[in-house]
Regions:
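Amphipathic, hydrophobic secondary-structure cores in small proteins
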Residues: 34-35, 41
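N-terminal pre-triad scaffold of radical SAM enzymes
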Residues: 3-9
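Flanking helices and flexible, charged tails adjoining ferredoxin-like Fe-S electron-transfer domains
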Residues: 46-120
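Iron-sulfur cluster-binding cysteine motifs and their immediate structural context
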Residues: 4, 15-32, 46-64
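Aromatic-flanked redox-active Cys/Sec active sites in thiol-based oxidoreductases
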Residues: 7, 22, 38
């Protein structure tokens, strides 16, 4: 679930607001976006992936909020970690994202299930 936006890193570009499928964020009047509807967060990480400033921290727990501070997530190196390990933007060459390979895995699993159901 989205936990925080580090205001001194945020560039107020609005990309996180635009990509959020559940409309969790609202534009701030003078600063970073506001976490307006946190309970609607699906923990899809889209906001974190699209944040080039690495200002957003989404905790992997989708059922409850986790109490963290900006200082903690910075010290632990959590900011930008999901983007990096997903091979997003500048990390493409160093950490290639091979999740597209799952398409083949799912297709083969579906074919195997169909064959299994055809047998008497």
């Amino acid at each position: 679930m989205i936990e925080l936006i580090v205001s001194d890193r945020c560039t107020n570009c609005g990309d996180c607001i635009a990509v959020c499928p559940t409309n969790v964020l609202d534009a701030g009047e003078t600063g970073p976006p506001i976490l307006a509807r946190v309970d609607d967060c699906q923990t899809c990480f889209m906001c974190e992936l699209h944040c080039r400033a690495d200002a957003i921290y989404v905790a992997p727990d989708c059922d409850r909020r986790v109490s963290v501070t900006a200082e903690e997530v910075v010290a632990l190196g959590h900011l930008g970690q999901y983007r990096k390990h997903s091979g997003w933007d500048e990390w493409t060459q160093q950490f290639p994202n091979e999740q597209w390979l799952m398409e083949t895995v799912f297709r083969r699993a579906g074919e195997a299930a169909a064959r299994r159901s055809e047998k008497p």
